[in-house]
Amino acid sequence: MVNFTVDQIRAIMDKKANIRNMSVIAHVDHGKSTLTDSLVCKAGIIASARAGETRFTDTRKDEQERCITIKSTAISLFYELSENDLAFIKQSKDGSGFLINLIDSPGHVDFSSEVTAALRVTDGALVVVDCVSGVCVQTETVLRQAIAERIKPVLMMNKMDRALLELQLDPEELYQTFQRIVENVNVIISTYGEGESGPMGNIMIDPVLGTVGFGSGLHGWAFTLKQFAEMYVAKFAAKGDAQMNPTERAKKVEDMMKKLWGDRYFDPATGKFSKSATGPDGKKLPRTFCQLILDPIFKVFDAIMTFKKEEAAKLIEKLDIKLDSEDKDKEGKPLLKAVMRRWLPAGDALLQMITIHLPSPVTAQKYRCELLYEGPPDDEAAIGIKNCDPRGSLMMYISKMVPTSDKGRFYAFGRVFSGLVSTGLKVRIMGPNYTPGKKEDLYLKPIQRTILMMGRYVEPIEDVPCGNIVGLVGVDQFLVKTGTITTFEHAHNMRVMKFSVSPVVRVAVEAKNPADLPKLVEGLKRLAKSDPMVQCIIEESGEHIIAGAGELHLEICLKDLEEDHACIPIKKSDPVVSYRETVSEESNVMCLSKSPNKHNRLYMKARPFPDGLAEDIDKGEVSARQELKQRARYLAEKYEWDVTEARKIWCFGPDGTGPNILTDITKGVQYLNEIKDSVVAGFQWATKEGVLCEENMRGVRFDVHDVTLHADAIHRGGGQIIPTARRCLYACVLTAQPRLMEPIYLVEIQCPEQVVGGIYGVLNRKRGHVFEESQVAGTPMFVVKAYLPVNESFGFTADLRSNTGGQAFPQCVFDHWQILPGDPFDSASRPSQVVAETRKRKGLKEGIPALDNFLDKL
């Protein structure tokens, strides 16, 4: 299938029931890119000889040097199912050729924003788990995101070669390892999923259904229970069964698959399956999975790796494996690779699992539409998305920008959800801040070219129908990172993606040569486009700040900035951590502020949130868009708020969505609604720049108790009320025991038992604490989980490696915000140092402003 012309691809694109959009997700170094190679090599875009070494989807030079995936890349594959295999597909189909759009995404947690962007445009996910180290923290994070986006998972147990050759597990232990991983994954799915009654039905993975693959990406072999069930159905078949039609055959194979997993046993003497572990004569029976599936694999491994030539030759003949002449002379690992590749090719097993079990756009968009589209569920756009209708109006989501070879220009990368996108089509380009009916963040422009993304290559194509993934040229000037492209006039936006990590580490950058400043600014603009997560901010003091998810993320952003985007030498400051400001108890006095003309008074108090509410707002469980009464009920039940107060939430802040709340608990105040907008504006301003050191506030609830206003409207305009509201809010915070919050990482460290002591030493020096330690069953590895302040995490990896002889591998994920102990007003405490440093860096007056500046006397 090498001669893939664009016309051939275009023809399959119309068969939307035969398209699969899927991403490959996993923990770092569990072998995603290597597995992707087997798929690409099977579907024919790399020469098969080079598969396994090419890592085709790692397109950047630094990715190949560091052996990690940094950006997600897209490739289209084509796979044909045989008549027999088509019978397994439970959804609608259209012919036997399948177009698979595969996105390989990074596993490293600092790039999880790339993963989010990849998930948005796909409907299914291949979750790769290293069967030696099991389900890790990043697997869980990514899987949780996938389920939140309603993406159906299938599982692949990778690195079986390690389990056999390094750990020398016996079949029963290996079965238990697999069983445990399947259980762990299902626990995550059932915790975050919607259950069987949800719109997707049951999405738990189960080897019996064929949604779990086993194998080794590096050696290029893999199987699901389906492959073995087919072998045994053929073997046990009676003579008359040879003429079975595909549907009957599929039914037989499915019955066989049920017998190959779980507590089912096989009696080799009689050739019968049984449900009890002991045979009729009382001897222990082997488990079917071990006897019928693992045993042949173990035999092949054993014969070849211990150089038993005759036995190996016999096995190869018995399993009916045809080797090339050049492979026959090999021995040891190379021969093992060749044999296993021939017998259980990874490409076939995985591509069959993908085509049979992952949903097509037709199936998936029915239940994903309500999550994807912000507008009413019955307008033209929503119906087009639900039905995946190529004749509907165009709705397309751009999930990220991909840099082109031409410096400074980007392809917009995204997926068509309804309609048809074509070269030269005039479209509405809507940024994330667009609201229907307004002009801002909206551009009417033609699309210059539509292109196909092929890993390292780009192919121009005339037009692309819905259900497909595509790149656009000429849209990049109008969008920053993401956006919606449509031809329907009253369309709403596609929902903005939620990132699982937040940018908490920031560095200031400046050009070494001041004359290069314009280039730096231009470079920052491009950097903000090319990475979905990074934030580029210009401080009021004129500093240029880059905020990222962690050290590695920032390092790569800075490298990109220096080499690709700005192309100038750059000086950078030490990394700085963002803090949040909060309060720890209720204001001890009622705070009053008067407006500049002394005619209006505001009375307010502040108090801290109950535990968990700020996190609920971050997750979107409680939000400004919710229906009023429903939100009030939730707050009353879960957090014991007063229902009438909960109904009178004026707004959330900063930015209208943040984790602070302004409630109105006044009784019978005249003209209150006229100043509502002004007070809200003051609140947004105050929560964005807190009183301690102008950082965002978090977890503060402000109550408006009473307002006295001037009767004449001209004396209570915005100019009078906004600064007053801000002063009053600051006074509330200062009287309510203000505190600083710092971000905390969850660190997961894998290491051998003997170096655990060294880890504790490093963590204690860095204010970290261990909250869980467990042994990975069946291996000598320990997993230590700890909380570590982000502030202390710089150089943590290097420190850890030097203290454990390089045997510990940490993974840091942003987990939560925690109050920094100590009072910022006490000059000896840690928070007061942080406040002083931050104020100095931002060029503010020294010392926290005194309460008298904000609090007025009656």
From Swiss-Prot:
UniProt EC number: 3.6.5.-
Binding-site positions, GTP: 26-33, 158-161, 216-218
Lineage top rank: taxon: Eukaryota
Keyword Transmembrane helix in record: no
Keywords: Cytoplasm, Elongation factor, GTP-binding, Hydrolase, Nucleotide-binding, Nucleus, Phosphoprotein, Protein biosynthesis
Keyword Oxidoreductase appears in the UniProt entry: no
Entry's family note: Belongs to the TRAFAC class translation factor GTPase superfamily. Classic translation factor GTPase family. EF-G/EF-2 subfamily.
Protein name in the entry: Elongation factor 2
Organism field: Gallus gallus
